[in-house]
Amino acid sequence: MEEFIKKNVDEEDVKSMMFNSIRGNERFVQIINTPLILSRLIEIVRYKKEIPHSEGEIIAEFLNCLLLREKEEKQDARLDIKRLTYLLRMIAFESLENKEANSGMTESEIIKYCVKAMDTYKFEYDTLYALDIMLQLGILEKRENMYVFSHQAYQDHYYAMEELAVIQS
């Protein structure tokens, strides 16, 4: 793990924060012991200069940072993080409720899930633009004309957000 950090992190302050967070903290080392979680944690530390302490927090913060960075760097007035998050929540929720795990979705299924999100939460948004952003940021991938979440952890995160909203309503 230390070799991975040395090899993939140039910024001394980020290296220092990473090393300080893992020294003597075996539980945290176990949490970040996969390349996905470790690489996402590095990106969070680069962007926010803070360390989330659970796998769920790391995934949530990474996805949030990804959207914030895209909004700030591109200065894209059409990128509405809140609405995009509602769409991702519904896509994750509906796809997991209707299918097994991270199985593929057609474009028409994704559009249907997005329309449901917009109806449920009473907003409008350009669905094809949103889908393009989700693909550009690597939240979703297109494989053989089917769309999937790039990582099961992303789908699980957005599913949990929507499930909580359903329970609380």
What annotation goes with each model-predicted range?
Residues M1-V166:
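Extended hydrophobic
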